[in-house]
Amino acid sequence: MGRIRQTFIKRTGEELIEKFAGKFTSDFEANKKAVEEVARISTKTLRNRIAGYITAKVKKMNA
């Protein structure tokens, strides 16, 4: 079983995927940089969690 992510992380990740779909890939490191460019995230931990959620979502869409 995986970890349950907070609603804020899911909502923010899905909004970013909708607005900037072409910027995100299945590479976590690239997604960290993309999240930093397109959104004002206050902490590194939050940025990483959102980037991780986006990475997992993109991998599921491509599978």
Curated annotation (Swiss-Prot):
<dbReference type="GO" id="GO:0006412">
    <property type="term" value="P:translation"/>
</dbReference>
<protein>
    <recommendedName>
        <fullName>Small ribosomal subunit protein eS17</fullName>
    </recommendedName>
</protein>
<dbReference type="GO" id="GO:0005840">
    <property type="term" value="C:ribosome"/>
</dbReference>
<keyword id="KW-0689">Ribosomal protein</keyword>
<dbReference type="GO" id="GO:1990904">
    <property type="term" value="C:ribonucleoprotein complex"/>
</dbReference>
<dbReference type="GO" id="GO:0003735">
    <property type="term" value="F:structural constituent of ribosome"/>
</dbReference>
<dbReference type="InterPro" id="IPR001210">
    <property type="entry name" value="Ribosomal_eS17"/>
</dbReference>
<dbReference type="InterPro" id="IPR018273">
    <property type="entry name" value="Ribosomal_eS17_CS"/>
</dbReference>
<dbReference type="InterPro" id="IPR036401">
    <property type="entry name" value="Ribosomal_eS17_sf"/>
</dbReference>
<keyword id="KW-0687">Ribonucleoprotein</keyword>
<dbReference type="GO" id="GO:0005829">
    <property type="term" value="C:cytosol"/>
</dbReference>
<dbReference type="Pfam" id="PF00833">
    <property type="entry name" value="Ribosomal_S17e"/>
</dbReference>
<comment type="similarity">
    <text>Belongs to the eukaryotic ribosomal protein eS17 family.</text>
</comment>
